[in-house]
């Protein structure tokens, strides 16, 4: 089972042409693992959250491909489309939790971690091309727009952005080609990250 790639913190957003930039949603990191009819949700800390977030599980079962691993962030979205960490953390909205999917680590029995990110993103888009509710592919921008995107994220009160090099493979642990730049005014900046509620 794949472990998690983790971004390094930075103060400056990469601006080269080979970088993808994603808005950082404020949620819990999860991998969705499907093997036939069996779906599991694995947290970054190794916990099993399969029974906690039924919408994600039901959606994963509806996807036509029946063997895959996707990486993403479990979120509760407000009416404005912005992730609401307090609603997620409270546990009162577990039936509404969706997955913001940003990577695909395996599909149809093939390990995709050695593929470049750009190709993994293409595979993820194909997997989710029917736009199943409950799991959605993370939008991203490419290239020089990164610093401008970060400024806009801060203006809208979002957590920040994560920038990833399009040609790099997926490695467990801290990755210098995944760079997180956080909005210092956002509550998540001072909060201990990815702390799941007690089971």
Label each residue range with its predicted role.
Residues 1-199:
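Catalytic cores of nucleic-acid ligases and guanylyltransferases
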